[in-house]
Amino acid sequence: MTYQAINFHQKFGLFREQWQPKVIAEMNDYQFKVVRLQGDFIWHEHKDTDETFIVLDGVLRIDFRDGAVQLAAGEMFVVPKGVEHKPCAEHEVKLLLIEPRGVRNTGEQESERTALNDVWI
């Protein structure tokens, strides 16, 4: 077995596209995904799972139907399952997402922002 640290900076250097999560590791049935984003996402929910957002660089706002939370680099937030939300960022943000394998980024919604799942880098 090879033991090697995963470097976020190096992983972000491998892609430029936004709103396309890339898997960098797995733990049990959970995937760790890096993603770049800027602008508004779509309103969506994940009915069967929570979703964790960890901001590595930039500022992210997650809108909810009854409020919002703003996250800066070094902060995280767990969106509870079944809660409709919409991530957005004025400037590019780099995130680490933690969610179960197979979770689609747009939940059950279909849009131009729906990304391929299980894309590894």
Predicted regions and their residues:
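Short secondary-structure boundary/capping segments within folded domains
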Residues: 23-28, 43-46, 54
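Conserved short histidine dyad/triad with adjacent acidic residue
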Residues: 17-18, 31-47
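Short, conserved beta-strand element in jelly-roll/cupin
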Residues: 36-37, 46-63, 98
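A cytosolic small-molecule/anion-sensing beta-strand core signal
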Residues: 28, 56-57, 72-73, 91
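Structural motif
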Residues: 31, 40, 59-61, 68, ...
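Short acidic-glycine-tyrosine-enriched beta hairpin
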Residues: 65-81
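Ligand-binding loop in jelly-roll beta-barrel domains
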Residues: 81-111
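A short, N-terminal "cap"/entry segment at the start of jelly-roll beta-barrel domains
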Residues: 1-33, 110-120
